[in-house]
Structures are given as structure tokens and as C-alpha cells.
Amino acid sequence: GAGAAAWAAVPPVVVDESHDEARRDHPGYGSQPAYVNNTGRNDLVAARVIHNAETVTFQVECREPITPSTDPTWMWLLLDVDGRRETGWEGYDFMLNRRLADPTITIVEAWQGPGFTWREVGQAPLYLDGASLAVELPRTLLGLTGDPFAVDFKWVDNPVVEGDLMAFLTNGDALPNGRFNYRYRGQ
């Protein structure tokens, strides 16, 4: 299952500071307008990855229960499976959760290019349990057929603007923050 209790014993865990998705409303300096940003929604606080010979599973945990999957730009998972920036959108070869078949099935999209252009290449089960979300992917779908392998990953919630990497810095929440990725090495 996707619940945090089921994942508690799964190392390694990567963490993000909590409360960094807070809504912002502050007066501007002098005659400058107020700075208002209400895009904070799901506070991403931890992530884990596990794999076996057939699948690789990514899990993210939020500080509070995750909002409904019908929310716009909801809980994206971006994957770089080849470590080459030039072969994907900002290096990302796959994107999940931009589109869902239903609340329990995500559409797996591969970068098609140019720009922020994706095409469906498969579907995968989503496991949502309160503040925990997991997705299980066939390794063959991602081209991760041998051992060892490495995959860079990033969770993003509510960047608002599709195709703008800088939105990861200002809108919603990202794990890890900004333009960074985490790397999982499968042995």
C-alpha cells in the first residue's frame, strides 16, 4: 500500500523542509504592490524509491492528506532515466500524473519534444492513502532493464504553469526544491 506506515521501513528516505508551501501575502516596499502567491497546496516532506526485477516504485509523503487528483497540475513525478539534459524537457524523459485515466491510474508520458511536448506510452497504478502517494512502474517501460541503473526524480505539486521550470521555484512545492533532482541507484 501507499500508506506511510507501510513505507516507514523502506530506506533510503529523502526529506524536504515542511511548511515551505505556505501561501504568501506581504505588502510591497514603498509604492510596490503586495506580493501574493496562493499556489501552495500539498506540502511535500519525504520521498522513497524501491525496485525489484520487474518494477520501480516511487512514493511521496505530504505533511497533511493529499488534495484530490482533480486539482490542476497535481502531484507531478518527473523522471530522468538517461542522465542527459538534451534528451528530454529540461532533462526529464518521463512525466507522470499530468493526466490520469482515473483516480487510481496515472498516464505515463514520454517526452516527445520540442519544448514541453509529451506523448502517452503507458499507464500505471496510483496508490493514494491519506498523506502518501505511490506509483508503481514497469522497469521495461522506462528502459531500466539492467542492473545497476540510476534514475533522477523530482516530485512537483501545483507549479501552475506547464513548461516553465522556474515555476518550480515560486509556485506550489517541489521535492527537492528548485531545479534540483534526487538520484536513485538500483543495484
Regions found by a protein language model. Give the residues of each.
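Beta-strand-rich interaction surfaces with strong enrichment in secreted/lumenal proteins
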Residues: 45-48, 121-126
